[in-house]
């Protein structure tokens, strides 16, 4: 059974359950430990959601809408994902996680979608926990991507899928070496991947919220298969 390191966040349970139901073992990674200790004995890394990343990490001044930045977490997770890739560990990055992944490798972020992207959809759906799996908008998925392969049973019209949404930031300039694997109808980047890595995928929505019903279990199963392969 592959051991998945899951970065600590305020809402851990759905991430934990998603990994368990896909056949993995969970080890929570606290930001207080060393990078070496965090990676010891794990077969894959799952980056979780959370607060905004400090814009200084990608060379920008903070927009007024950027709040609740956690500098220590930013520093730790950026170093962690770089070390994980150096060690060829499979990586699945969710919500804030996709943003950490992009920033760690030289990309930038849209700091506030409502004020910086004209004609944007509503991406920050404020819903109670029991409705966290409600769909918010469609995605357009690149046909030859890892994401498309994993989500083939979920796609409508060959390349679209509905997802939930709870974010006000997004990938802006893509990190070198990565490719876009999904976008929202308004052009917001919703998934990225690194084609040269064994498994390195970031998604902006919250597939973990669907662990009870299994709509996105294939994402976690694909991640765990890569972790097993080592």
Model-derived regions: residue spans:
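Conserved G/P- and acidic residue-centered "switch" motifs that form tight phosphate/ATP-binding loops
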Residues: 95
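N-terminal beta1-alpha1 cap of cysteine-dependent amidohydrolase-like domains
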Residues: 1-92, 102-110, 114-155, 159-162, ...
């Amino acid at each position: 059974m592959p051991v998945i390191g899951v970065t600590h966040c305020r809402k851990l349970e759905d991430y934990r359950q998603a990994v368990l139901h896909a056949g993995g073992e969970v080890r929570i990674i606290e930001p207080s430990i060393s990078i070496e200790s965090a990676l010891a004995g794990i077969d894959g890394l799952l980056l979780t959601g959370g607060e905004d990343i400090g814009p200084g990490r990608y060379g920008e001044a903070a927009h007024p809408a950027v709040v609740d930045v956690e500098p220590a977490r930013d520093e730790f997770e950026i170093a962690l994902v770089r070390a994980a890739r150096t060690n060829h560990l499979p990586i699945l990055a969710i919500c804030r996680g996709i943003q950490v992944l992009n920033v760690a490798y030289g990309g930038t972020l849209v700091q506030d979608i409502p004020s910086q992207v004209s004609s944007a959809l509503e991406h920050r759906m404020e819903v109670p926990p029991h409705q966290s799996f409600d769909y918010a908008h469609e995605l357009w998925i690149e046909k030859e991507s890892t994401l498309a392969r994993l989500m083939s049973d979920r796609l409508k019209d060959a390349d679209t899928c509905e997802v939930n949404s709870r974010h006000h930031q997004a990938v802006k300039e893509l990190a070198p070496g990565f490719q876009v694997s999904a976008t929202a109808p308004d052009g917001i980047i919703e998934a990225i991947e690194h084609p040269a890595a064994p498994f390195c995928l970031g998604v902006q929505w919250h597939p973990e919220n669907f662990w009870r019903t299994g709509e996105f279990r294939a994402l976690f199963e694909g991640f765990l298969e890569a972790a097993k392969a080592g």
